[in-house]
């Protein structure tokens, strides 16, 4: 699977990690927290996008 992802600088990545940790500390599951932060990043990001390839490991 390929996805267009925001290209983030280190500071933005660090803030995203901190936001995920904050949400998890409030009781949200890690998957939900990651999905929410990813959605927020996509909605607010105005810079470049990178293409990433994800492989399903269900096989």
Swiss-Prot record:
Database matches in Pfam families: UPF0181
Organism superkingdom: Bacteria
InterPro entries assigned: UPF0181 (IPR005371)
Similarity remark: Belongs to the UPF0181 family.
HAMAP family given in the database record: UPF0181 (MF_00507)
UniProt protein name: UPF0181 protein YoaH
Species annotation: Shigella flexneri
